[in-house]
């Protein structure tokens, strides 16, 4: 199980993980690592939250919010943001399904993808700033949001089909069992409620899960399934929705 954790950490982040820590693990086994997603989100969000706390007293809340969101993007190598941009480029092209999937494969950034990146990043910075001004514990909020975003992405894997013939997302989409889905969602809920006691964390988690479930159904209807890009979009939007729900 420890090998799966290190493999997942290296897979969805840019944190330096020695290859020997996940040595001998077959790529096809990665689907079992979905249960690690909330914990990986907890780590990434915790680092981002620490950066916010360290910078807040030095440069103020707005700049601290800017740098903690920038750090989060760098920690993931922009992996999920790229998926968000590609998904929006494809979906909002208003073309046929096959053409949408082709556009999503294009490495060039389109207008809709650019607008989506601007909106999501700016919204995160503004929401983090507002939460801090309201006295929300930001280390806990950011760690919980990242755990919620990654945990809720399992809703786009279970009982969904892969929209393409091949790709990274095929490792998870349609390969996750009901038991793994329940464990992943349960862990995300536990992380959120422990870090944000009372109804605040639980309520934000419920809102996030409902929103991502609806997103998954809309994407399924539009694309005929899910891709690695739509998983990235779900993670980014899940983080934002969780933070918004804390307001």
Curated annotation (Swiss-Prot):
GO terms for cellular component: plasma membrane. One of its GO terms (biological process) is cobalamin biosynthetic process. The keyword Transmembrane applies. The chain crosses the membrane at residues 34-54, 59-79, 113-133, 138-158, 171-191, 194-214. It catalyses: alpha-ribazole + adenosylcob(III)inamide-GDP = adenosylcob(III)alamin + GMP + H(+); alpha-ribazole 5'-phosphate + adenosylcob(III)inamide-GDP = adenosylcob(III)alamin 5'-phosphate + GMP + H(+). Its cofactor is Mg(2+). This is Adenosylcobinamide-GDP ribazoletransferase. The lineage of its organism: Bacteria, Pseudomonadati, Pseudomonadota, Gammaproteobacteria, Enterobacterales.
